[in-house]
Structures are given as structure tokens and as C-alpha cells.
């Protein structure tokens, strides 16, 4: 389910044409700052869950997330992939309730959770 956080971490990348990467317009967003700020994290999560307003970068993330999940972040920049890993690790270990809400919305049939099962297990703190 690296998918959803992938997108979260991509920090709102823009839709790319086939064969290209998503826009790096938002790659300067400090993912760790977002994760450590309840206000910022809540804003992104509420945007992704259709529970709140979206900032421009939040909207791009929301629009890009389904594609990133479907195609294993194949259009993500290296910075976006790294950010996605950071976000996934944080949500899985520190905010499992948010992870679950996002999973219900973006992976209701557990397709991606099954596809990324090994990766998810590897980030869990035991």
C-alpha cells in the first residue's frame, strides 16, 4: 500500500504524460515538517479523504495518487519516491488510524495492500 503514501509523499505531483515523470513542482516540500505538524498532516489527510479543502499541492496529490498507486509510482521522481517511503513508514508506525482511513478510501478491495504486502511488512516497527 505504498501507493497512497507514495502519493502523499509525492506532495502533489502533477499528472504526467505517458513515459514522463510527474512534475517536480512540489518536490521542495519538507515531508518531515508535514509529518511532524498535526495541522499540516491533518490538512493533507482531510483533502485526500474529501473531508476538507485542498491546497493547490494537496489537490495535485489527490489527483495523482490513483495513478501512482496503479503504476507503482513509476512516474515519480527519486525525491517523490523517497518522500513516499518516509510518509508510509510514519503513517504505518505512528499514525495507523490515518493509514487505515486512507487505505479504505484508496484501496477498498485491498488490491494494493496485497501487491505491496512485503514492502509494508518491511517498514513496520516490531
Swiss-Prot record:
Main location: secreted
Compartment(s) of residence: Secreted
Cystine crosslinks: none
Signal sequence range: 1-18
Pfam families tied to this protein: OS-D
Membrane-crossing segments per the record: none
Keyword annotations: Allergen, Secreted, Signal
SUPFAM superfamilies with a match to the protein in the record: Chemosensory protein Csp2 (SSF100910)
InterPro entries tied to this protein: A10/PebIII, OS_D_A10/PebIII_sf
Source superkingdom: Eukaryota
Cellular component GO terms, alphabetical: extracellular region
Similarity remark: Belongs to the insect A10/OS-D protein family.
Protein's name in the database: Allergen Tha p 1
Species this chain originates from: Thaumetopoea pityocampa
Lineage: Eukaryota, Metazoa, Ecdysozoa, Arthropoda, Hexapoda
